[in-house]
């Protein structure tokens, strides 16, 4: 069984336990580069399926490397055709709320690729034990809350609404699948994406 740490803000976790100085950092699913807002870094690469994010980031932070990957993603890139390909290696990979919107087969394949190119991975996900996270998503997206019992009883559960997908995992199940240990995370209550655990691989 995976031991869960106490709740913490993942930003504080990075400040306390992760040394980024002189490290090559890959931000997988970087979106608009929010990682740089709380952890400025010199040797940073952001990768995302959204071309508009990458183009905007190139203008805002031209000193960093930005990669557009046209990979399939149920929520953000349904027409994507590529698989994740990396040509460099990195000391650290961070990924916030990306596994949340992927199916298990895609997660396993993606994490396998990331592990080949990154020494340390920090990947967030939703737990099937966290009713508050589930209810917060439902409130935020106007989704009926009738599925919690199903989510709570399964090792893996997909909550689909229109073309949106949220994936919930049993902690031990996903940690075993990805050969990881799990840490408990908590952002502020105003950010539902932060109500996640973080796999440390």
Regions found by a protein language model. Give the residues of each.
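Active-site charged/polar residues at nucleotide-handling catalytic sites that mediate phosphoryl
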Residues: 88
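Short catalytic micro-motifs in class I SAM-dependent methyltransferases
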Residues: 97-98
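A conserved beta-strand element that flanks and buttresses the S-adenosyl-L-methionine
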Residues: 94
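Conserved acidic residues
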Residues: 23, 91, 119
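Class I (Rossmann-like) S-adenosyl-L-methionine-dependent methyltransferase catalytic domain
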Residues: 1-23, 28-84, 102, 106-109, ...
